[in-house]
């Protein structure tokens, strides 16, 4: 029996997570530029968000295999959300310190590859349940992720 629900839910999660990741990649450097006026500091925070992203990619496949696809997808998005939620909390309590923003920016990006990998590994099963061939499902999935960054 064909059920589109798992595929639609997976793609909705992909769009939401991708949109959040895209916004964060722009928002942190922009926030630093607005608060400090220093372009070098903005570039530094952009690099700080990229380096943990690259390093965490090395272990995401193993984490997905050991902990489970759905669990890793949900947990990575929750951890990323909590890291980003620290920005207004810090702004209201301690103030927006550049050093704290560097730490929060690094934390916000370290979890994204695990969620992306977990959602990609769920694609074949969701596509099969929806009656889609894998090539079409993969095209839809990658388009959804690309669309998310445009938002």
What are the functions of these language-model segments?
Residues 1-151:
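Alpha-helical transmembrane-bundle signature of multi-pass membrane transport and export proteins
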């Amino acid at each position: 029996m064909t059920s589109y629900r798992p595929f639609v839910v997976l793609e909705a999660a992909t769009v939401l997570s991708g949109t959040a990741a895209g916004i964060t990649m722009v928002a942190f450097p922009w926030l630093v530029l607005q608060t400090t006026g220093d372009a070098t500091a903005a570039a530094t925070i952009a690099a700080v968000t990229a380096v943990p992203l690259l390093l965490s990619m090395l272990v995401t496949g193993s984490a997905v295999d050991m902990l489970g696809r759905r669990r890793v997808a949900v947990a990575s998005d929750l951890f990323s959300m909590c890291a980003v939620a620290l920005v207004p909390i810090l702004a209201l309590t301690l103030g927006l310190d550049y050093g704290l923003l560097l730490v929060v920016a690094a934390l916000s990006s370290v979890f994204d590859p695990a969620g992306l990998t977990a959602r990609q590994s769920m694609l074949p099963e969701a596509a099969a349940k929806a009656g889609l061939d894998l090539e079409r499902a993969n095209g839809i999935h990658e388009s959804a992720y690309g669309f998310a960054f445009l938002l």
